[in-house]
Amino acid sequence: MSSKHRAVVKDKWKMKKWYEVVAPTSFGGITLGSTPADDPEKLIGRVIETTLYDITGDITQVHVKLYFQIISIDGNKALTRFKGHELARDYMRSLVRRKSSKIQGIFDINTKDGYVLRVTIVALTSYRCNTSQKKAIRRVMREYIFKKASELTLDELVQEIMSYKISNEIAELARKIYPIRRVEVYKTKLLLIPSPEGPKPAVVISPLQAREE
């Protein structure tokens, strides 16, 4: 590498500033990490992956992957919004047992404050169940999660998912139909956010990208 090229690379790093990536207030507003950029607008739209363990310090939550998206810059802080979560596949595989059934439901739900969230719920039975019992359990999931979402804000709903309150309540209702070993909210994804013009896709585009388009 020529000395001139090394100088250019060095100068580019000198131009960069470090920004503190901050979790939403619903996750305590803690620092998720830091990232460099020569232009803060380049950070907008970037997705940050972490785990619930990194936020709470509880090692039993290391399998819960969280996704936050940078939506704005405030001074040297990159502010984020919850984008979704997913349980580690190895963890989900460890829950599966022979001679039992797995019932999955995917629902697009509306929160009280106008967000639309796609939720994937998985119920694992103690024994193998029949088709009609699976349908009944899936119906319990649907009725419960639609009602619950309509009563809570997005932040409240996400916290009840993370605390296993929703999983436990669904399991309790489903056990009236068939023995349930476990219920997990396997995955969530933010689809729509409220706006004065009505719900709009939860897509964050960097101002730089918008100008290029």
Curated annotation (Swiss-Prot):
Belongs to the eukaryotic ribosomal protein eS1 family. This is Small ribosomal subunit protein eS1. GO terms for biological process: translation. GO terms for cellular component: ribonucleoprotein complex; ribosome. One of its GO terms (molecular function) is structural constituent of ribosome. Keywords: Ribonucleoprotein, Ribosomal protein. Disulfide bonds: none annotated. It comes from Desulfurococcus amylolyticus (strain DSM 18924 / JCM 16383 / VKM B-2413 / 1221n) (Desulfurococcus kamchatkensis). InterPro entries: Ribosomal_eS1 (IPR001593), Ribosomal_eS1_arc (IPR030838), Ribosomal_eS1_CS (IPR018281). The gene is rps3ae. Pfam families: Ribosomal_S3Ae.
